[in-house]
């Protein structure tokens, strides 16, 4: 055989037809190949081999699962959903399969596991490979675990943050001051962003806000905003919105400001490890990438919130301020009350309804949501120089009261693609107080779980509507909260969950 | 609907028919279910949900992968090979799918991640869940990472070792002295076990040796032995072999002496992390479970061996002796030279060939392998009381020289199922010296990598045959080593790897 013919032969030995299996492996790209396929046999691939898949100009590293079975046709490479989306091949396109390049950055992960400090070069190498999708879930888990707790010192956290900024897009708004906010951890119903952005933008500041969808909660800010307007904007559409209105509230995932963070989250979610360094790097890298200069961090503290003590909040807050300074962000903190849900609704549409009530100045609008939003907006107005120190809150209240914030919110929604009607659910179940007394505590985590079982955030109108707050007196039989669901089955499922748990609302019987 | 009918309805909602997908996910049980199946819909399962699968009296915890696609029939639960073997269902058997029970022991893993000490109760809880298959690969990775390096102190290592012994079988040989040996870490070609066991057994000691397959190396002792005789013996067959011959060399995994170790290894292999505590617990738990009383630990030291300095060997050795004492094992150490490969072959069949040459007293047998085996056998003969102190080496040499060891080895192979022929490969490539000089150093790790890329240990005949040793003079063009492969693709791949690396053999040009 000539050299040319041999090379051609060799190329053919490493090609298979792309086939979409529809298997959702969460985000890890997996390729399914028959053990008797020409590629496995000629290359000596076995299960767990890390392989490089190439389709046209796109490539992705995937983990191989070898298959013995006829459901996978001969000559095809079955792709998991993550692999399919990474390659985006035409139907029946050729996929070239080869060994994944050696991952030299794993030596840094090992060094960190063994307790050594990593320098900026090491973090750049690791995060570069992570963002490029070269780490398997196991490698990601080792890296996340090795950095968990307080294992990253200040300079390591700075280096990690810079590395995460470096691999993403970085927006430039051509303005001296660009404000932003972030709320750490879950507090059901805490949708202040949808109020803060229009208030602040109405005062002339620039606030291009990217928000996340729910990861483990019944609604993320992006999910709630999506009830009212499109949020899947690309960077060009986001830019048009901000240039026209001074603000936006879009989904961060579609602008991919921090691609490394998008990857790390896939193991952080199931592992559920607290990691101060990674939290700081995740938050601040996205703010820096969004082109922000001044960032307000809202830290709700409570026994069932993410941050459980004021000391923990202060320690985390210090780290956020220090790392922010190192990467050129001015960070300010507000430690807030995280004892109970904010507003009444928990779930995208129910929360959107609360937001609209506040913006429209309705008499029945939840006052806690309004007060929280005004305090945060006031802080940002002062931070961004739109109000003298001490008068931000007053300015924010004026702008909300006189309808400028509501007008600005409508303008933002229009610019993002049009204001939408809030949907409602057909199936509801009211949960009432078993005894008379006073509401002593509310378990935020279990309440959030009930809202998810009722269908939130997949069914945007589903969730929980809360009717009583801590300290409220209640009569036996008085409604405490209402489950909202899109289907009878989901209502049943959430209702059964609530019935079989200790009460979500603790009622202390009065003497 | 009556309560009874409703309960029946609910039971039916959680059942699917078992279907074997043939997908090899290495060892993690995965269940594939259609997103529109009744179970996903009624239970709210999503991808990555940890579910409990029950088929008849057997159950297993698996990770769910949701599928959109018609290759998976409606109403079936597709099982990965690991899930299929764990449940062993009849064809079309009903599988009940429910949420996996809460894993309380994860709180201990998190505590360890955050740097806290774990007590015996914590290790028992974690290892109990690990051995029962309740940990996903991500949880295993977090645990292994959190215990890596020197993160386990002495009492934690003792507790981990005891916990690992407690979940496995523990053999009882009814004899006062049962000897064993273990070699720490990789030294390519170091197959002294296949020589030590027959020598020691020929002198009347009992040595029921369980060995591992390759984890990250081109051959484990069990892989090499399997070239010569079956090693997948169950405990009854192992017992028959030892009762008949005084020794055996079997695969530890098939007798499941340390089921927790068998599970941990599935993430340790790809992560490739060093962990003193886990190494000690892994080694000693298997020795204790095998019913050993006296254990010789061979610690090869060299710049590219697993243990790189005499100090590191002594520190690890102390830990092995201390933990051994705590669990009732008498542990003795021999620190050996780990500068270069032992024998000539690297890979199961090539190593087996070297072993046979030594046993048969062939003139071309590798002397380094022979000398190493004699020293270790001599130590064990003294440790087990079969030779007075100082005369073990001489006795070992006599038994090897007069053919008693070879006869014993053949008896052991026969008892294990029959002595086999050693296979050879069709594809070979000779790597030669680029310059004349003297061999100054050999990179064991890169050499092992080349042997693996050539196909070892999956292709037992594949690997590397080494033709020169440190200190040998070589001419330019003289063969240094030969790659052996079962397929042209693998030979090509290994050859390309060798060509594009710095030379594996360092040749210092003579003045």
From Swiss-Prot, chains A, B:
Enzyme nomenclature, EC number: 2.4.2.4
One Pfam family this sequence matches: Glycos_trans_3N
UniProt keyword Glycosyltransferase, yes or no: yes
Family matches, as PROSITE patterns: THYMID_PHOSPHORYLASE
Catalytic activity: thymidine + phosphate = 2-deoxy-alpha-D-ribose 1-phosphate + thymine
A GO biological process held by the record: pyrimidine nucleobase metabolic process
GO cellular component, as recorded: cytosol
GO molecular function (one): thymidine phosphorylase activity
Alphabetized UniProt keyword annotations: Glycosyltransferase, Transferase
Cited InterPro entries: Glycosyl_Trfase_fam3 (IPR000312), Glycosyl_Trfase_fam3_N_dom (IPR017459), Glycosyl_Trfase_fam3_N_dom_sf (IPR036320), Nuc_phospho_transferase (IPR035902), PYNP-like_C_sf (IPR036566), PYNP_C (IPR013102), Pyrmidine_PPase_CS (IPR017872), Thym_Pase_Put (IPR028579)
Family stated for the protein in its record: Belongs to the thymidine/pyrimidine-nucleoside phosphorylase family. Type 2 subfamily.
Protein name: Putative thymidine phosphorylase 1
Organism lineage: Bacteria, Pseudomonadati, Pseudomonadota, Betaproteobacteria, Burkholderiales
């Amino acid at each position: 055989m000539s050299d040319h013919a041999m090379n051609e032969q060799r190329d053919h030995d490493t090609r298979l037809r792309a086939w979409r299996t529809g298997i959702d492996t969460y985000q890890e790209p997996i390729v399914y190949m028959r053990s008797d396929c020409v590629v496995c046999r000629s290359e000596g691939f076995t299960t767990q081999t890390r392989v490089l898949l190439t389709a046209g100009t796109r490539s992705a590293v995937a983990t191989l699962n070898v298959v013995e079975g006829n459901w996978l046709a001969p000559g095809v490479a079955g792709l998991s959903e993550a692999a399919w989306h990474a390659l985006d091949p035409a139907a029946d396109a050729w996929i070239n399969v080869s060994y994944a390049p050696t991952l030299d950055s794993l030596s840094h992960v090992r060094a960190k596991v063994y307790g050594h400090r990593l320098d900026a070069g090491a973090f750049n190498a690791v995060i570069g490979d992570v963002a490029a999708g070269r780490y398997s879930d196991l490698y990601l888990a080792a890296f996340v675990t090795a950095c968990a707790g307080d294992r990253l010192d200040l300079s390591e956290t700075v280096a990690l943050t810079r590395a995460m900024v470096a691999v993403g897009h970085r927006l430039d708004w051509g303005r001296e001051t660009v404000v932003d906010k972030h709320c750490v951890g879950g507090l059901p119903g805490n949708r202040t962003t949808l109020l803060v952005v229009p208030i602040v933008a109405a005062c002339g500041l620039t606030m291009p806000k990217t928000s996340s969808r729910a990861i483990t909660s019944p609604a993320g800010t992006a999910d709630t905003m999506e009830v009212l307007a499109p949020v899947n904007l690309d960077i060009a559409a986001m830019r048009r919105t901000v240039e026209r209105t001074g603000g936006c509230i879009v989904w961060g995932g579609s602008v991919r400001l921090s691609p490394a963070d998008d990857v790390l989250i896939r193991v952080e979610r199931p592992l559920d490890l607290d990691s101060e360094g990674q939290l700081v790097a995740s938050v601040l890298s996205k703010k820096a990438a969004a082109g922000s200069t001044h960032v307000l961090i809202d830290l709700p503290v409570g026994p069932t919130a993410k941050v459980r003590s004021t000391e923990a909040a202060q320690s985390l807050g210090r780290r956020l301020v220090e790392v922010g300074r190192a990467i050129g962000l001015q960070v300010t903190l507000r430690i807030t009350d995280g004892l109970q849900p904010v507003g009444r609704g928990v779930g995208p549409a129910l929360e959107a309804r609360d937001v609209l009530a506040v913006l429209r100045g309705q008499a029945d609008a939840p006052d806690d949501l309004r007060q929280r939003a005004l305090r945060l907006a006031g802080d940002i107005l002062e931070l961004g120089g739109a109000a003298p120190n001490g008068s931000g809150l007053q300015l924010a209240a004026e702008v909300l009261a006189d309808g400028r914030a509501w007008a600005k919110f409508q303008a933002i929604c229009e610019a993002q693609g049009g204001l939408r009607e809030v949907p409602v659910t057909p199936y509801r179940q009211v949960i009432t107080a078993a005894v008379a007394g006073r509401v002593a505590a509310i378990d935020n985590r279990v309440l959030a779980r009930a809202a998810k079982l009722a269908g939130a955030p997949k069914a945007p109108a589903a969730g929980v509507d809360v009717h009583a707050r801590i300290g409220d007196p209640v009569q036996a039989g008085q409604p405490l909260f209402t489950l909202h669901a899109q289907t009878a089955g989901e209502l049943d499922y959430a209702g059964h969950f609530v019935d079989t748990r200790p009460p979500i609302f603790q009622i202390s019987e009065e003497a």
